[in-house]
Amino acid sequence: MIPLRRLLPFALMLFFAAPAAAAPRNPCQDIEDVGASYTICVFDTRNDSIRLFLADAKDEVYGSFSALDAALVQKGEKLLFAMNAGMYDERRLPIGLYVEGGHMEKSANTHSGAGNFHMKPNGIFWVEGARAGVTETQRFLKERLHPAYATQSGPMLVLGGRINPRIHDTGTSMKIRNGVGVRDGHIVAFAISNQPVTFHAFATLFRERLKCPDALFLDGSISALYAPSLARHDRFRPMGPIVGVVERMR
């Protein structure tokens, strides 16, 4: 029998050599940028399942994070993050291109009109496998992209590393805003302001702080975030399209 005092050094060596348990990843954080408060959530499509959601099997619009989460739980999945994802009509149906699970439920809207959606150029956030992008609408149509998920909104905040020329640094409209940007074809950054900000300040956040060469405005007045890692669950107005990150329940 080996004496305990001879086993102790070996046991200690094994203990310190063992890898530490991985800390749970928190994709969301609160930040300040040029005096304004934001919450940002960053994901990688190579590892994270980013999807769009609108209605259940009965064609009833989810309308809330709670309803969506409950539906996912029934499928053995859970919601890690969610945000409103595009503008919609009085029935809470998208007013622009909407693709879910490879099925196009609404075609691209290229009409002119009033409001932020029609503040050209507008654009499309899309996900296809491990790739994602924010693409100006006309370019998206010209390239004939067929992603698994897509939502159209407007205006584009950043295009090719430049702030949308229709967004001026002299703008005075201050609102809560949320949007999405993509870099390197797979890093997806979502942001929501925690206080009213101008379009230019919001666009600058994506270009300078989040390093996204392309970014899209999702909405303003109804902006909402579900981030359980931050104990945040916004419950404001009923929503239309929702973007979420999902994982299988263990």
At which residue positions do the language-model features occur?
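Bacterial N-terminal signal peptides
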Residues: 9-17
